[in-house]
Amino acid sequence: PLATFTNNLATMIDRIREETGAEIILYSTFPPNPKWHYGSHNMEAYAMATEQMAREKQCAFADVYHNWLAIESKKKPEDMLSNNINHPNDFGHWIYFEVLERVGL
């Protein structure tokens, strides 16, 4: 559930900072292929929760979710997924790269 996800994410961020002092970048997931009937199709809620957590914990945030949707308006999901379900192919990984580069990496 979403509440468990956000609690676990907050715990991980706190622990990483306490134990390592490392910089933290949170990134959202991408939407699943809408043709996949067995997937979790509420990924937007998780993307928004991750963005909110980044604001609350003052972490960098890479918005893969909305960038993926913008590209998906011009390409089919199958063009970005290696298994046509939930694993990005090289183009899907390029989207992650582009979003992370905009964050400053």
Segments predicted by a language model, with ranges:
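Alpha-helical cap/lid subdomain in secreted, periplasmic
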Residues: 1-105
